[in-house]
Amino acid sequence: MKTSAIVGIILAGGTGSRLLPCTKVTNKHLLPIGEMPMIFYPLKKLVGAGITDILIVTGTEHMGDFISLLGSGKDFGCRLTYRVQDEAGGIAQALALAERFANGQPMCVILGDNIFEDSIEGMITDFTNDPDKAHIMLKEVADAERFGVAVISGDQITQIIEKPMEPPTNFAVTGIYCYPGDVFDIIKGLKPSARNELEITDVNNAYIAVSRLGFSHFKGYWSDAGTFPSLAKANELVTLSAPHF
């Protein structure tokens, strides 16, 4: 079933510095996970949820490689558009480049190094049932200090803390987000963080401040693939669960 009102955005930029020297010659999202390039996984998740109008944001150096690999999107049952991120400036800065593409429509955003088992159809349903709210996916993890961590009270997220030394919960904020079209107004009001980036955590906390952030939990596995240990883990999970892909 086509989810025509929602566009998809895959953020596949960044330097991949934690995967050097492999990323000296290619973008990390083109590295293999199981039998496919990493970028195939978020693409297939979006298409599987009926989202077929998709933007890929990546840097200048390897843009041609993405186009050579993915083309128009026809082979995947979607229509692909590409946007260059001239320099790394944070996840929210990369998302801001999608404003013209989204054109006021709601969107599902996936960080291209997130590998996960569950379908996102349930998340999309929850989002479309309450479209004024943003919606994020959480996953309980053992190493929550590596991620943004959600503080939950009842059925509400009260705060997201970015990479806390002593996490108050083990609920990591994964790189899968649904946003209404006004997310770009929020991004325009952000100030750079201490590392001089526009942080997606600040976007999500802005929605929390006005009680407009919903959430769901992943039941199956989830892994980012931005470090060698997590890349190896993602390969292991995909290999063991090959029928799901």
What are these regions (language model features)?
Residues 1-10, 18-21, 32, 36-110, ...:
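Conserved N-terminal catalytic core of the sugar/cofactor nucleotidyltransferase
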Residues 71-77, 151, 206-208:
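Short, conserved catalytic or adaptor-binding loops enriched in Gly and charged residues
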Residues 146-148, 152-158:
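Conserved catalytic core of nucleotide-sugar-dependent glycosyltransferases
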Residues 30, 150-152, 215:
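A structural signal for short hydrophobic beta-strand segments in well-ordered beta-sheet cores
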